[in-house]
Every structure is written in structure tokens, then in C-alpha cells.
């Protein structure tokens, strides 16, 4: 099936040129998986979107409306990838300052599920540092230039993913997902405090979705921690929980527990 886009609940492929999402990146987005016409973990994604709207003072559309639109858009799709973008809407005045009277624009696109990535999965440390801005930390906002630059560097280096540090040298995430590192048998993930996206899979794993065999905890680490990593994994909606086979040219171990964790994540479809 071809890609399908709805704008504000209607089939369309164009936005107004003065939409603040285009002008300033003034908005948020969610990427969701679709299985057998069902949008997976929709409640968790809409809850994160609502938190972002509250932080940015964007009027959040009614969640039942969004849920109904997304389920209708995805009806009949066996397996697909769905992106929901919410902008503050068309500008009501020139300049950065919103008037408060903007009407949000919602854009939903459903596309075929991407082909599997080639293996072995390789990562490198990005030359791009994430700027620290606690007001935006955790949000999946539309300003993604740091990730664009990091992915350009990854492509030039011939690797799949770039692991990103903040301006203080702390590990935060990958350019396209959260990161998990096993050190001395313990799986760790960096806290999302000053920057980075608080992913839905990461949230589920911290809440115990991986089962008793995958006790995950937050811990700050930097380059030295990565150097001691026995295993590394990346998560996002498309990849699931992806094992990293090589980091910076060093071959890593593969923890067999990750396959069981992925099975547990897949089984919990909500």
C-alpha cells in the first residue's frame, strides 16, 4: 500500500507556508508502530505528546479525536510505520512570539514498514554534541538538526548509528534512539536530564517490560563507560531493541537476554 497522509483529519499533502512548525520547528512528533491495523502503545505516545504540549504551551487536541483519526488512517494495514506531527499551527503574527490564538496543525502519515537493517550493526561516537536545554529534555520536538548532522557523520563513516554526548561529555542517546550499555553484567541507560528524547521503549523497559531477567537502571556515563561496555543496544520504534555488534571498530558481545526482552516487548502490544 502507498503512503497516506492526513492533515487535520482529511486526506492532504500540503501545509500552509506560514505554519510555525515549518518556520521555527515549533511542534512535536511521535513515531508509532502499526500491527494488523492496530496502533501499538498509542496511549503511551499520546501521553508523551500531551506532556510536550504542556511544556511548550501548545493546545493539545482531544486524545479521543487523535486516537480515532490514527486508527482510521491505519485500518487495513498489516504492518506499517506511523508518524504523527503536531505543530502550533499557522502563525497569527510575525516573529517568534506566539499569540496564544494559534490553532494546532496535526499531520499523520502511514507508510510501509521499512526493510530490515543490514547486519552487523555498527555505531560510532558522534562529533556532534547535544546542546543542554532542560526545558526541552525528554521531548520529541521538531528541532532535529543535531541528529541530522550526526547521521550525516554516521553515513560518511559507514556505520548505522551515532552515539551522542552532551556538551559536558555525558552519554545521552543515539541519533535515532535510546542507548543501553552493559557494564559488569548490569544493563544501564543514561538519564534524560538536560537533553535527549525519553523514548517509549526506554520507558517500558525502565518500568519492567523486559522481565526479571533484564533489570535496567539509569546511570550517567561518558566515553570511559563506553570503553568498558561488554554489550550495547539501541532502541526505537523501527528497530525495536537492536543489538550493536561493533562500536568504534571494537567487536562487542551479544547478550542472549536481549532476544527474550524483544519477545516480551513484542508480546505486550496494548
Question: Which positions does each model-derived feature cover?
Answer:
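Helix-start/capping segments and mature chain N-termini
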Residues: 1-64, 68-72, 76, 87, ...
Amino acid at each position: 500500500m502507498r503512503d497516506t497522509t492526513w492533515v487535520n483529519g482529511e486526506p492532504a499533502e500540503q501545509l500552509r507556508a506560514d505554519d510555525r512548525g515549518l518556520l521555527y520547528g515549533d511542534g512535536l512528533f511521535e513515531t508509532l508502530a502499526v500491527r494488523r491495523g492496530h496502533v501499538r502503545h498509542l496511549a503511551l505516545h499520546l501521553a508523551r505528546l500531551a506532556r510536550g504540549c504542556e511544556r511548550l504551551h501548545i493546545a493539545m487536541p482531544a486524545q479521543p479525536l487523535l486516537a480515532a483519526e490514527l486508527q482510521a488512517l491505519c485500518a487495513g494495514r498489516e504492518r506499517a510505520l506511523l508518524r504523527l506531527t503536531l505543530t502550533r499551527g499557522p502563525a497569527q503574527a510575525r516573529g517568534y512570539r506566539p499569540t496564544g490564538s494559534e490553532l494546532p496543525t496535526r499531520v499523520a502519515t502511514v507508510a510501509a514498514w521499512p526493510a530490515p537493517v543490514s547486519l552487523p550493526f555498527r555505531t560510532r561516537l558522534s562529533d556532534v554534541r547535544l546542546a543542554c536545554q532542560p526545558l526541552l529534555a525528554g521531548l520529541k520536538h521538531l528541532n532535529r538538526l543535531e541528529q541530522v548532522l550526526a547521521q550525516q557523520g554516521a553515513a560518511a563513516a559507514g556505520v548505522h548509528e551515532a552515539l551522542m554526548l552532551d556538551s559536558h561529555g555525558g552519554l545521552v542517546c543515539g541519533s535515532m534512539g535510546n542507548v543501553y550499555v552493559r557494564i559488569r553484567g548490569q544493563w544501564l541507560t543514561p538519564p534524560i536530564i538536560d537533553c535527549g528524547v525519553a523514548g517509549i521503549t526506554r520507558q517500558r523497559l525502565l518500568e519492567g517490560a523486559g522481565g526479571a531477567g533484564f533489570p535496567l537502571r539509569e546511570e550517567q556515563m561518558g566515553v570511559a563507560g563506553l570503553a568498558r561496555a561488554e554489550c550495547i543496544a539501541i532502541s526505537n520504534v523501527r528497530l525495536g531493541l537492536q543489538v550493536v555488534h561493533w562500536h568504534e571498530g571494537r567487536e562487542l558481545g551479544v547478550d542472549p537476554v536481549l532476544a527474550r526482552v524483544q519477545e516480551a516487548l513484542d508480546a505486550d502490544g496494548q
